[in-house]
């Protein structure tokens, strides 16, 4: 049995200092029934907690660390930038370099604005869509999480799903009434919403792959249908690629599925592990953002040199060949997890998109939030705790996916499959 004495003591102290002892709810490990692990360091595919335990990491800071922990090039870039100054409140050339890379690789982006988080990106994109169209309502999908902005924290997934809260208290009714929610992967519901409110729907915002109800890819024709419906009704299509951006493919989710939105939100990978976000799209739309246009958005640390340098060094290391290797590794892990579950008669359903993998403990195919909620949460919690004992660090929620990095080796994946085999053999009915 692993020892967690230092993590337990640190969490006891933290609960007097921060709400619930953490700075983001899912980190409290509530849904898996254990004390959170306090991490001390990471290198490559491994993390080490303050008690000295080593884990193969599939959290990767919730997705940003596509090259694993403490990537040499990212670390050197950060050292170099920090020595010259961390922020100036003035433009820097590194902003241009990262912006060029993003514009080159993301099909929908002709102009991009850097911000400090994915939440900032989605909130700003919604304001832009409303300002550009002159309409008020937005359409989102049940279980899709787009950050904690009031307009979007309605029937969201992620930590909200884990805590069993459909919404958050504190969201005014006046805000909520302008957010239409329909089931993910249900194109007919989208069409019906446009029949009812089409003249006032500014945009549809969607994750190309839903990542906060677990990993739920789009059904064939779903994204194409959204593109068609929005174009027919004069609404904008926004892809929230904070999670999928540069993770599922070299050209992001929109390149992977061949559907180009009007606006795209980015985060996570483009910051290389530092706080970052971005939104961009067609030049005609983006030129409405201040100071080019009247739609205001600003940020003290937006485009700061540290985040830009980390993001640039992260993206330049990604090539089309990187994603071929991601596909191979992810297929290997998916097949191994499936084989272990089948061997022990564990009800399960595995979804995957590129290097994102979700395993649900249910017999039901998971294509939307209702199906995801059919998962056996008690079994997941027990499985999670056993995987920790086996030295594998997974996201502590059934409603989050696993992430792979370029640092994960075949040996890491084989060890993870072996750990899952042991865990499932102990937990089978």
Curated annotation (Swiss-Prot):
This is Glutamate-1-semialdehyde 2,1-aminomutase 2. One of its GO terms (biological process) is protoporphyrinogen IX biosynthetic process. Its cofactor is pyridoxal 5'-phosphate. One of its GO terms (molecular function) is transaminase activity. It comes from Bacillus cereus (strain ATCC 14579 / DSM 31 / CCUG 7414 / JCM 2152 / NBRC 15305 / NCIMB 9373 / NCTC 2599 / NRRL B-3711). It is an enzyme of class 5 (isomerase). Its main location: cytoplasm. It catalyses: (S)-4-amino-5-oxopentanoate = 5-aminolevulinate. The modification N6-(pyridoxal phosphate)lysine is found at residue 268. Pathway: Porphyrin-containing compound metabolism; protoporphyrin-IX biosynthesis; 5-aminolevulinate from L-glutamyl-tRNA(Glu): step 2/2. Keywords: Cytoplasm, Isomerase, Porphyrin biosynthesis, Pyridoxal phosphate. Homodimer. Belongs to the class-III pyridoxal-phosphate-dependent aminotransferase family. HemL subfamily. InterPro entries: 4pyrrol_synth_GluAld_NH2Trfase, Aminotrans_3, Aminotrans_3_PPA_site, PyrdxlP-dep_Trfase, PyrdxlP-dep_Trfase_major, PyrdxlP-dep_Trfase_small. It is found in: Cytoplasm. SUPFAM superfamilies: PLP-dependent transferases. Its EC number is 5.4.3.8. PROSITE patterns: AA_TRANSFER_CLASS_3.
